Structures are given as C-alpha cells and as structure tokens.
C-alpha cells in the first residue's frame, strides 16, 4: 500500500490504524520522538494512535500539543525525529502525518519508502512490557521557538498588520509574535477551531475575501495595514498589500529574492521548476544565480544544504530560511516580508508593482494514475518534435523559451496532469497552453 505522497501522508478520514502502524514502523529505527498537531478535530485521535505504535516499539514520545509545523520542525533538533499531525491546506475532513529529521528537513522519498516497506511487510519489532516507551509533555516548545525567532529578527518599524490564521495552528503563535515584534496587530480567524469556521485553510483569493475587505476598510482612512495569511499548519503564508490585493505568489517570491541578494550579498538562491522567470530577470543585474529544483520543500531543503544558499522558496508561499532553520516557516516568512518593506522604505504594493508582470496560465487534466507515466513519455517525445527543443525533465517535462516556458507535470496527490505556462505575451501563453493540453489529452487517449 502506498501511503506517502508529495508532502507526507494526507488522507480524507485518515484511519487511526494506519497512524498506529506508522508509529510502530518509526519505532524500529527511532527511539526518541516529538509530536505536535494542528487544530483538526481528528488531531487527538491520530496523535494517540501514532503514539501507541511508537510506545509499542519502544520509542519514547514527547508531546508538545497544538502547534504550527515550524514549531515542530524547530523542536525536532532535540530528538531523533519530529512528527507533525496535519493536512496543511486541505479541508477539515482530511488529516495527515509529516515526518521531520533532527535538522528540520522533512523526510525524503527514500526514508518514506523504508517506512512503507516495514508496514507492508509487517516487519515490526514489538517490545516486551519492560521496554515499552514512555510519554512526557513539554509545554515550552512554543516559547522556545518564539524567543529564537525574535532573537534573529531585525525589525525596527511598527507596522500595522492584519494576521489571518484560518482558525488553525498559526493561532497559537502568529498574532502574538507579530505583536511582540512591535506591530499593531488585528487578528482574524484567530481562535483555534478544527472545523475552520472562518475560512478554509488554503490561503487563496477566494478564501481571503473577508480579510481583504477588512484591510480595505481599515486603509480607507489611510492606516496602511498589510495582511499576512496562513494555511492550516502555518508553514506557508501569503501577503495582502495596502490596496487589498492578495499578492501574486510569484511576484512576492521574486521581490523577496531580490531583497535578500541586495541586503546580504548572497550569490545564489533556490527555487522550483514552476517558479516565474521574473526571478532570473530580477537577479541577473546582481550576478546572483538561480538554482531550480524539484517541486516540494524536501527538494528545496536538500538543495539548500548541498549548495549553501541562504534561502529557498516555492511560488506556493512555502519558504525556507536556512540561516534560521530548514523547516518551511510561514510565520518567519511573514515577519521577513516586513523586514523587506523596512529595508526599501516602501509600501508592499509599491515593491510588488516593480516586479515584471507576465501572463500565467494553469490547467489540470483528469488522468488515471496508471496512465501518467505513459502521458509524460509521450509529452516528452512529442514536445521535442513540436518545439524543436530538448525537454527539461528535472520534475515533469518543461520547455523553456526566450519569452516563456511550459511545464507539464503529473500531480503527486490527485489523478491529474497539470499544465503551467508563463509568457511575456498573452498570445504566446495561449499557444503554449493549447499545445500542452492537446499533448496531454492525446497521451491519455493514445490516439
């Protein structure tokens, strides 16, 4: 049975028996674990089940309660591994399990496959009564993270900030840490509720409409509030500018990369194959190299360690700040957006509007999982003929041009093939998208 997707285990109505087996499998090679959970109603159930499996295999467990993923990832340094019970941006009926190494990086596919093999082969090591693991509670994890982040923050301006936590794990840290950093904070959806009663946890324009309206209302009197919104476990963030615009993920990432290079003199940053070409164009004048890697925080973190780059970010709002820790951190990212504003002495909308605007298109085509590889093989060969270019196959199939690019990639969690296009001209973007969709559909039908 395949359990792990592109970001740990995520399932609708996650079976606690699966969680128990995951815990039991972990205990074979790890003997000291820390566990946290987000606000989902099934969080206690899944945490209890995975804890039972860990204990049965002789692994000691420290529980830190309801916390954001960045807190769990930071805490993992004191244990053999960290376990986060979360389904991130998915709806409330979902839950999941994400595993972290001591250094804060998420488990890579090889590590996850090893656990799957233990589970599928029933290769467990059950302990005798006198070797069962024990459970302790640590109520200081949030405080330790809080203090560590503030010690490494360089913010002297008292910004006005609306913080939207989606009734999720960010509630226990984000409003307070922005306040402690000197901001005047208005909290939205800031009480913990695993039903996500205020909005769904995906921080997109549709779900953030009420928060946008609040910011527009506040700023009608010239108050200059910006917004920081999180997903379900606060490993991501998106900003809302003073005009009430949910910032484009790609443009925010490009602006932040430029800021880091200008401020620190960094000679390289890491991003993924689906990020905007505006990043290269923005950083070329500073001689900084853009290193592209596979989609996902695991690949980004691995590349950061390999290259020594100080920052890696995805256009999903998943950013890793290597100088602080290797866990994606939406809380720290939000604070550092404010540092960027202070550095330039500009409003957020002014910074974002300086980033080049290109035509971006995204489509997804239904595709049975068993046909995905055939489709990608066809797209690679056919695309090479059509575009008269060698495909880039780091993650999916990508063709790059002087004025744009197309990426065709199978979803790792759903029965879709995704087509992403970016171009400087709308006509070229539409042409690329039409060609991409046609290739995928032909690859599926075989005709």
UniProtKB/Swiss-Prot annotation:
Enzyme Commission code: 5.4.2.10
Catalytic activity as recorded in UniProt: alpha-D-glucosamine 1-phosphate = D-glucosamine 6-phosphate
Modified residues (Phosphoserine): 88
Alphabetic keyword roster: Isomerase, Magnesium, Metal-binding, Phosphoprotein
Active site location: 88 (phosphoserine intermediate)
PROSITE patterns, alphabetized: PGM_PMM
Pfam families: PGM_PMM_I, PGM_PMM_II, PGM_PMM_III, PGM_PMM_IV
Binding site for Mg(2+): 88, 231, 233, 235
InterPro entries tied to this protein: A-D-PHexomutase_a/b/a-I, A-D-PHexomutase_a/b/a-I/II/III, A-D-PHexomutase_a/b/a-II, A-D-PHexomutase_a/b/a-III, A-D-PHexomutase_C, A-D-PHexomutase_C_sf, A-D-PHexomutase_CS, Alpha-D-phosphohexomutase_SF
Cofactor note text: Binds 1 Mg(2+) ion per subunit.
Gene3D superfamilies assigned: Alpha-D-Glucose-1,6-Bisphosphate, subunit A, domain 3 (3.40.120.10), Alpha-D-phosphohexomutase, C-terminal domain (3.30.310.50)
The keyword Phosphoprotein is annotated on this UniProt entry: yes
PTM comment: Activated by phosphorylation. Glucose-1,6-bisphosphate or fructose-1,6-bisphosphate can activate the enzyme in vitro. However, since glucose-1,6-bisphosphate is not believed to form in methanogens, the physiologically relevant activator might be a serine kinase protein.
GO biological process: carbohydrate metabolic process
Cofactor(s) the protein needs: Mg(2+)
GO MF annotations, alphabetized: magnesium ion binding; phosphoglucosamine mutase activity
The UniProt record lists the keyword ATP-binding: no
Record's subunit section: Monomer. Also forms large aggregates.
Physiological role: Catalyzes the conversion of glucosamine-6-phosphate to glucosamine-1-phosphate. Also catalyzes the isomerization of glucose-1-phosphate to glucose-6-phosphate, but at a 5-fold lower rate.
Family of the protein in this entry: Belongs to the phosphohexose mutase family.
Protein name, per record: Phosphoglucosamine mutase
Organism listed in the record: Methanococcus maripaludis (strain DSM 14266 / JCM 13030 / NBRC 101832 / S2 / LL)
Gene: glmM
